């Protein structure tokens, strides 16, 4: 059986209740290795510890070329705010075939469900 994909949630300034319900969290934990950090941006140490295994990144985590070079498995970066901060090397992400998506500005249940659906489909190469 294939290893479960690592989905990394770093959705500051969104809180846990805005990102997923307990049911969604439980389902994500069944199909993926789920790491999340709430209350502030994830510390660089936490990101660096997991960067090589992250397949789906949800949040505003800085992803310059140097970090993208380390992220061998990443398939998608899903922004949770209504902006496009210059903290991602968008050109390099595009060159590598990494999807950069946005669920912002709404964090309504339908949008959250769409993000979960994107994460599942990307993790299964659909």
What are these regions (language model features)?
Residues 55-126:
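Phosphate/diphosphate ligand-binding glycine-rich loop within oxidoreductases
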Residues 1-54:
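N-terminal glycine-/charge-rich "phosphate-binding" loop or analogous flexible N-terminal tail
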